[in-house]
C-alpha cells in the first residue's frame, strides 16, 4: 500500500474520539442522570425564592444556623440559586441533555424505524425457527390468511408463496416524536431564559408607570421590554370577609401609549393576570401608599404612609401630620388595612381616637378629616417568549407518548408444498399478540 493510499484511508475513516464521544452522549444512563439533575435543580428553583433582594436572602438564609448545615445566603448567591433557570450551568445541562437526545435519536430511534420499514419475505421454513411465536400447519393458504389479517388491521404484502404483514408502525414513530418534542421543550426553555425578563412594581392607586424595576433579564431580552407603552393603575381595592379577613384583591389596569391613550384595560386578581404583547402582569401583593387628609379648610393633602416594623405582629402602616404651621406639634396616623379605620396618636404616643374614612375629629385645636386611604398594588411582571415553544413541545410530547403505546406487530407466512408456516413478533403487548396469532391459526384450520 502506498503512502497516498494510506493517507486517503485515514481521511475517509471517522476519528475514533468523535465516535466515542457520540456513543457516550447517546448513552441512556447519561440521559437519565442529566434528566435527574435538571429535575433536582428545577425543584430547587421552585423551592428557593427567585429574584429576591440581597436583604431577603440574608434574612431567610442566615449563616448561623445554615439551612441543611450548608445552605447560606453566600452559598446560594455563589451558585446562582437565586436565578437558577438562567445560570450558565443550568443552561449547559439543558444543552447537554438535548445533545444526548439528538444523538440517541440518530443512533437508535431512526435506525429502528428504518429497520421496521425495510422488511423482507421469509423464503425458507428454517427462518421461522428464529421467531418466538411460530407454527407449522398442514392446512392453510395465503389466500385465506390475507383477509383474516386485513380484518385485524394489518397491511399485507404478497410475493409468490410468501406473505408479510405489519401493523402499528406508528409505534416506531412515537419515540422519535417524543425525542423531538423534548428537544423543542428544551429549546423553548433556553430561548425563554435568554430573551425573557422578570420585574416587580409597587404602584399607588391612580399612578402610571413603565416597567423599570427589572429583577432579572436575559442577555437577549432587549426586544421583550416594553418601550412604547406603560400601565396605569386606575383603582386598587380589597374585598374583605365579615370577619375582616382578605378574600381577594383587585387592580383595575389600563395599558396606555406614550401619549396616555388607553390601548387595553382589564381588572386583574390573583391567578387572573393581564397579558399584552407577550408581557404578563400578575397580582401578587398589596400595600398602603398613603392617606388623603384635610386640615380645617385646607386643600386635600396626600401623605405617604410607610410600613412599620412590628416585630412579627402583622403589618402596620403609619405617617405623621403636623397640626401647627411651624411643625412643632402633630399626630401620628396608623392603619392595618384598607377597611377605612385609622388610629390617631398624639405627640406623647397616647391613643386619641379611631377614625373612619370621611370623619372629622378635633385635635390640637384643628379639625382633621380623614378623606381616603390610598392603596398600592404589588405587580409581578414577566415576559417569556419561550412559552409558546414549550407548549408546542408538550403537545407533541403527549401525541408522541400516545403513539408509542401502539404495538408494532409483524407476521410472516410461507406456503411450501403441503406445509404452511406462520409466525410473528411484536415489541409490546405480547400476551395480546399471542392470542391474536392463536385465533388466526384456529380460523385457518377451519378453512
From Swiss-Prot:
The chain crosses the membrane at residues 28-48, 87-107, 173-193. It comes from the Bacteria. GO terms for biological process: cytochrome complex assembly. Its main location: membrane. Pfam families: ResB. It is a multi-pass membrane protein. GO terms for cellular component: plasma membrane-derived thylakoid membrane. Keywords: Cytochrome c-type biogenesis, Membrane, Thylakoid, Transmembrane, Transmembrane helix. It is found in: Cellular thylakoid membrane. InterPro entries: Cyt_c_bgen_Ccs1/CcsB/ResB, ResB-like_domain. The keyword Ligase does not apply. May interact with CcsA. Required during biogenesis of c-type cytochromes (cytochrome c6 and cytochrome f) at the step of heme attachment. Belongs to the Ccs1/CcsB family. This is Cytochrome c biogenesis protein CcsB. The gene is ccsB.
Amino acid at each position: 500500500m502506498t503512502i497516498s493510499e494510506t493517507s486517503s484511508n485515514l481521511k475517509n475513516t471517522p476519528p475514533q474520539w468523535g465516535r466515542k464521544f457520540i456513543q457516550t452522549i447517546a448513552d441512556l444512563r447519561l440521559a437519565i442522570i442529566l434528566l435527574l439533575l435538571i429535575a433536582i435543580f428545577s425543584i430547587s428553583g421552585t423551592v428557593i425564592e427567585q429574584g429576591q433582594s440581597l436583604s431577603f436572602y440574608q434574612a431567610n438564609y442566615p449563616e448561623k444556623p445554615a439551612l441543611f448545615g450548608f445552605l447560606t445566603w453566600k452559598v446560594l448567591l455563589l451558585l446562582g440559586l437565586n436565578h437558577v433557570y438562567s445560570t450558565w450551568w443550568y443552561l449547559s445541562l439543558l444543552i447537554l441533555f438535548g445533545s444526548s437526545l439528538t444523538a440517541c435519536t440518530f443512533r437508535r430511534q431512526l435506525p429502528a424505524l428504518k429497520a421496521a420499514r425495510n422488511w423482507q419475505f421469509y423464503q425458507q421454513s428454517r427462518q421461522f425457527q428464529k421467531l418466538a411465536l411460530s407454527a407449522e400447519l398442514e392446512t392453510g393458504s395465503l389466500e385465506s390468511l390475507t383477509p383474516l389479517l386485513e380484518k385485524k388491521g394489518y397491511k399485507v404484502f404478497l410475493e409468490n408463496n410468501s406473505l408479510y404483514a405489519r401493523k402499528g408502525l406508528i409505534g416506531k414513530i412515537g419515540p422519535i416524536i417524543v425525542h423531538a418534542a423534548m428537544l423543542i421543550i428544551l429549546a423553548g426553555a433556553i430561548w425563554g431564559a435568554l430573551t425573557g425578563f422578570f420585574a416587580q412594581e409597587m404602584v399607588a392607586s391612580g399612578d402610571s408607570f413603565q416597567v423599570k424595576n427589572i429583577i432579572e433579564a436575559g442577555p437577549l431580552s432587549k426586544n421583550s421590554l416594553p418601550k412604547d407603552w406603560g400601565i396605569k393603575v386606575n383603582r386598587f381595592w380589597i374585598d374583605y370577609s365579615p370577619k375582616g379577613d382578605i378574600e381577594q384583591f383587585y387592580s383595575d389596569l389600563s395599558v396606555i401609549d406614550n401619549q396616555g391613550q388607553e390601548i387595553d384595560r382589564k381588572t386583574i386578581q390573583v391567578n387572573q393576570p393581564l397579558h399584552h404583547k407577550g408581557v404578563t402582569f400578575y397580582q401578587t401583593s398589596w400595600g398602603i401608599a398613603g392617606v388623603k387628609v384635610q386640615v380645617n379648610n385646607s386643600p386635600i393633602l396626600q401623605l405617604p404612609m410607610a410600613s412599620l416594623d412590628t416585630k412579627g405582629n402583622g403589618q402596620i402602616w403609619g405617617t405623621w401630620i403636623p397640626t401647627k404651621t411651624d411643625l412643632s406639634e402633630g399626630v401620628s396616623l396608623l392603619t392595618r388595612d384598607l377597611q377605612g379605620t385609622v388610629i390617631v396618636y398624639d405627640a406623647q404616643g397616647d391613643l386619641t381616637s379611631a377614625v373612619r374614612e370621611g370623619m372629622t375629629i378635633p385635635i390640637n385645636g384643628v379639625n382633621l378629616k380623614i378623606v381616603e386611604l390610598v392603596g398600592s398594588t404589588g405587580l409581578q411582571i414577566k415576559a417569556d417568549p419561550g412559552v409558546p415553544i414549550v407548549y408546542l413541545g408538550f403537545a407533541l410530547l403527549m401525541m408522541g407518548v400516545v403513539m408509542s403505546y401502539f404495538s408494532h406487530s409483524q407476521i410472516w407466512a410461507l406456503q411450501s408444498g403441503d406445509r404452511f408456516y406462520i409466525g410473528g413478533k411484536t415489541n409490546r403487548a405480547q400476551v395480546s399478540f399471542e392470542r391474536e396469532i392463536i385465533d388466526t391459526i384456529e380460523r385457518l384450520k377451519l378453512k
